[in-house]
């Protein structure tokens, strides 16, 4: 396809075939990116449009699907007239060959009506935003049976689960907070040239990047 490319953010190697896939963001921050499939010797096989700002790509263990975590960050900041793209996960079927790949993009729109519950479950969300916009997929891992994808939502301090049989987001779970006043959770907050671990009356947010 002809499009202005931005960052190449991630690559993955197929578990069985001599094929790699790369996630490529568009130059425009609010434009959809592509998953590009190449043979092991660099021959172009296909390119499939995915969501906005694909940040990570992986194959399922059975090799039948590829997935991208499309972060959809508001890279131009917040404010009037600024677009905050939806965060999504694209699921690609590669079972019919790497030159005949089809893609379906999974959104989090089903959670827009559950915003209050997400906040109660300690999912971090910006005020007055819909979860489908504010959730930002960062990284994906897939269960050994290739049935479920687990998606790190770093800025939201949460993990989403995607059912790969139905290609639906079925849960978003907050990871809670780390209490540094508890014994065993000591840290050093002081920039004084010394290393002195001690408890502090603060909480931390896990915010996982990889998973």
Task: Spell out what each predicted region is.
Residues 185-191:
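Solvent-exposed loop segments that connect transmembrane elements
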Residues 1-184, 200-210:
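Mobile, glycine-rich extracellular loop/lid and propeptide segments
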Residues 131, 193-195:
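Extracytoplasmic loops and strand-loop junctions of Gram-negative outer membrane beta-barrel proteins
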């Amino acid at each position: 396809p002809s499009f202005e490319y931005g960052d190449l953010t991630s690559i993955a190697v197929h578990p069985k075939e001599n094929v790699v896939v790369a996630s490529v963001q568009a130059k425009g921050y609010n434009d959809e990116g592509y998953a590009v499939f190449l043979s092991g010797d660099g021959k172009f096989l296909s390119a499939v449009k995915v969501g906005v700002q694909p940040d990570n790509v992986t194959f399922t263990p059975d090799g039948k699907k590829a997935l991208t975590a499309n972060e959809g960050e508001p890279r131009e900041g917040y404010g009037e007239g600024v677009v905050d793209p939806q965060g999504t996960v694209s699921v690609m079927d590669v079972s019919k060959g790497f030159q005949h790949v089809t893609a379906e993009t999974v959104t989090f729109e089903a959670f827009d009506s559950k915003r209050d519950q997400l906040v109660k479950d300690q999912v971090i969300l910006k005020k007055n935003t819909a979860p489908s916009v504010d959730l930002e997929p960062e990284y994906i891992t897939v269960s050994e049976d290739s049935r479920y994808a687990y998606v790190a939502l770093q800025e939201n301090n949460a993990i989403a689960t995607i059912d790969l049989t139905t290609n639906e987001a079925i849960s978003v779970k907050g990871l809670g907070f780390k209490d540094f006043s508890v014994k065993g959770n000591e840290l050093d907050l002081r920039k004084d040239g010394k290393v002195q671990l001690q408890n502090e009356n603060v909480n931390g947010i896990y915010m996982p990047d990889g998973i």
